[in-house]
Design a protein with these regions (language model features):
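Solvent-exposed, flexible loop/coil segments flanking beta-strands in beta-rich domains
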Residues: 1-48, 121-129, 134-145
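Surface-exposed beta-strand/loop patches in noncatalytic accessory domains
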Residues: 7-22, 44-89
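Histidine-centered catalytic micro-motifs
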Residues: 148-161, 312-314, 433
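Charged catalytic cores and adjacent phosphate/nucleic-acid-binding surfaces used
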Residues: 57, 127, 131-143, 212-229, ...
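Exposed aromatic-hydrophobic patches
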Residues: 28-31, 80-81, 91, 415-424
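Edge beta-strands of jelly-roll/beta-sandwich modules across compartments, strongly enriched
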Residues: 52-54, 112-124
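Catalytic cores of extracellular degradative/oxidative enzymes
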Residues: 156-304, 321
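Noncatalytic modules at the cell exterior or secretory-pathway interfaces
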Residues: 38-41, 93-114, 427-432
Length: 466
C-alpha cells in the first residue's frame, strides 16, 4: 500500500512578549490558510517563572475552533491545538480546514512577570481516509418526574481537568449522581464525548464555563458555543451580552464562586436580572460559602429570583475535595432530561445537599407551594419541612427574608422527620430552610458554621394580596 504523501508548511511564526504593564487582555495574530490544507496545528510556547497565565484560542472563517490552557504548569509551557476533518486535539473542534483568514488569540488571563512567547502555525496537506460513520447518540436520561441529584460544575482534560469524559461519567455513576453538567473552560470540544456517555441512568447537560478576568460563570443548557471572551475594553461584547446570548439559546446563566479572591465575581456592571443560577455552596471555597450565602440573600431581597446551587468544580472526579458525590444539587424535575433539569433550575425547584434529603412546602390561602413557587397574602403561612437520612444531630433554621425566623434541634436517627411551623405575621418576601450538623462539643450557640452545612433549600416566595 502506498504511504500517504504529507506536506507541511509554516504559515506563521511570531515571537512576542507579555508584561504586567501595559495591561493587555488579548493578543491577536491573523494568518492566511491556502486551499487544500487538511490539518492545521497551532502552537504557543512560553516560559513561566511565577504567575503567567496564557490561554490559546483559534478562530477560522467559520468561527471558533478551540481553546487550550494549562494554568498549573511552570517552566516551559506548550499549548497546542490541532484539527482537521474527523480529527481534533484536546480542546479543539474537528472539521474541515477552510481556506481564508484565520486568527490565533492569546488570552493574557494574568501575569506578574515579563515572558517571551513563540506562536507557530503549521499547515499539513495529506490524503485523509474517510471518517468512520457514527451511530446514534445514546439516550440522554429518561422520562418521569422526580427528585434527581447531580453535579453542575465539572471539567475534563479538554480544559484543565485530569479526566476524560468517559472517566468523569463513570465517576458520576459510581458516586450516585443522576445528572452531570460538563462545564469545561471556554471550549465545547468535550460535548460529543460526554453525550456519548449518557444513558437512562445519567442525563448530561451541555454547558461551558466563561472564564473571564473578573469572574467565572457557567453557561448551562447550550445548543452551540457562546463567545466567553468579554474582557476587551474596546468591544461591545460584554458580560451582559453573553447572558442574553445564553438566554436566546434557552440556556441559563450562573455565577460561580463569587468570593474566590482573584477568581471571584468583579463584573460590577453585570445586570443581576440576567442571572439565573448562583453557587451558594462551592466545595473548594470553604469559608467563602458563608459570604456566598449572604450575598444570595441580598439578591433575593432585591427581587432577583436566582436559584441557589452547589458546585464541586471537579477537576479530578476520584481525588480529594474534587471527588464527585460529596455535595449535590437536587432538582425536582418533570423528567431526567436536559430540558427537564433546566426547567427545574429555571424556577428554583432545587436544594443543596451534602447527604440528607428534604421536602419543603408552604400553605396559605388554601394553596400549596414548593420551592421556587409563590403564595399570596393575607393569612397565616404554614411551613412543612420533611427531612430524612439524618446521620448527625442537626440544627434546623427557618429563614425569613434572609433573617432568622426560628430554629429546632433534632437528634440523629434513621427515621424521617416532619416539621410543621406557622407564621401568623407573614410579609411579602420568602422563606428558606437550612440544616447544619451539630458538633458533639460546641461552645457556639448560633450553629450556622459553613463547615457543618448539610442542606440548603431554595426559597418559597410570598407575594402580595391575591
Amino acid at each position: 500500500m502506498t504511504a500517504p504523501v504529507l506536506i507541511a508548511d509554516e504559515l506563521l511564526e511570531v515571537r512576542g512578549q507579555v508584561s504586567p504593564v501595559p495591561r493587555v487582555h488579548y493578543l491577536h495574530h491573523e494568518f492566511e490558510v491556502p486551499d487544500g490544507v487538511t490539518r492545521l496545528k497551532v502552537t504557543l510556547r512560553f516560559h513561566k517563572e511565577r504567575r503567567c497565565q496564557l490561554f490559546l484560542s483559534v478562530f477560522g472563517p467559520g468561527g471558533y475552533r478551540g481553546t487550550r490552557m494549562n494554568p498549573g504548569a511552570v517552566g516551559d509551557v506548550g499549548l497546542e491545538l490541532a484539527f482537521g476533518e474527523g480529527f481534533a486535539s484536546l480542546g479543539a473542534l474537528p472539521g474541515a480546514v477552510e481556506s481564508g483568514t484565520w486568527r490565533a488569540q492569546i488570552d493574557i488571563e494574568s501575569t506578574d512577570e515579563v515572558a517571551d512567547y513563540l506562536l507557530t502555525v503549521q499547515a499539513i496537506t495529506e490524503h485523509l481516509p474517510a471518517a468512520a460513520p457514527t451511530g446514534p447518540a445514546p439516550t440522554n436520561g429518561r422520562p418521569g418526574a422526580g427528585w434527581y441529584r447531580g453535579e453542575l460544575h465539572s471539567h475534563t482534560h479538554h480544559s484543565d481537568g485530569k479526566a476524560s469524559a468517559a472517566t468523569l461519567a463513570g465517576a458520576a455513576r459510581r458516586y450516585g449522581l443522576e445528572f452531570l453538567a460538563l462545564t469545561d473552560h471556554f471550549t465545547t470540544s468535550g460535548w460529543s464525548e460526554i453525550v456519548n456517555e449518557a444513558g437512562p441512568d445519567l442525563a448530561v447537560i451541555r454547558s461551558l464555563e466563561l472564564t473571564g478576568h473578573r469572574g467565572h460563570a457557567n453557561l448551562h443548557g447550550l445548543s452551540g458555543w457562546v463567545d466567553p471572551f468579554v474582557d476587551d475594553p474596546d468591544s461591545a461584547w460584554d458580560i451582559n451580552a453573553v447572558a442574553r446570548a445564553v438566554h436566546a439559546q434557552g440556556g441559563l446563566f450562573g455565577v460561580n464562586h463569587a468570593f474566590s479572591n482573584s477568581l471571584g465575581w468583579r463584573y460590577h456592571e453585570f445586570d443581576w436580572s440576567l442571572c439565573d443560577v448562583f453557587e451558594i455552596y462551592h466545595h473548594l471555597e470553604r469559608p467563602n460559602n458563608a459570604a456566598q450565602l449572604t450575598f444570595w440573600d441580598g439578591l433575593l431581597r432585591a427581587g432577583h429570583r436566582v436559584t441557589g446551587v452547589a458546585g464541586t468544580d471537579s477537576h479530578d472526579p476520584h481525588a480529594g475535595r474534587h471527588r464527585l458525590g460529596q455535595v449535590f444539587t437536587v432538582l425536582g424535575a418533570e423528567s431526567l432530561t436536559s430540558e427537564g433539569l433546566l426547567g427545574a433550575l429555571r424556577i428554583g425547584c432545587a436544594y443543596v445537599s451534602l447527604g440528607p434529603e428534604m421536602a419543603f412546602t408552604a400553605e396559605a390561602g388554601g394553596r400549596t407551594a414548593g420551592m421556587g413557587e409563590e403564595l399570596p397574602l393575607p393569612g397565616p403561612v404554614r411551613l412543612h419541612l420533611g427531612l430524612s437520612r439524618l446521620n448527625f444531630p442537626v440544627r434546623v433554621f427557618m429563614m425569613k427574608n434572609g433573617l432568622y425566623h426560628t430554629h429546632l434541634d433534632l437528634p440523629a436517627g434513621g427515621e424521617d422527620v416532619q416539621i410543621d411551623l406557622e407564621d401568623s405575621e407573614p410579609v411579602p418576601g420568602y422563606y428558606r430552610a437550612e440544616v447544619y450538623a451539630r458538633p458533639a462539643q460546641s461552645d457556639f450557640f448560633g450553629g450556622r458554621e459553613w463547615q457543618n452545612t448539610l442542606l440548603l433549600s431554595n426559597p418559597i416566595y410570598i407575594g402580595g394580596p391575591a
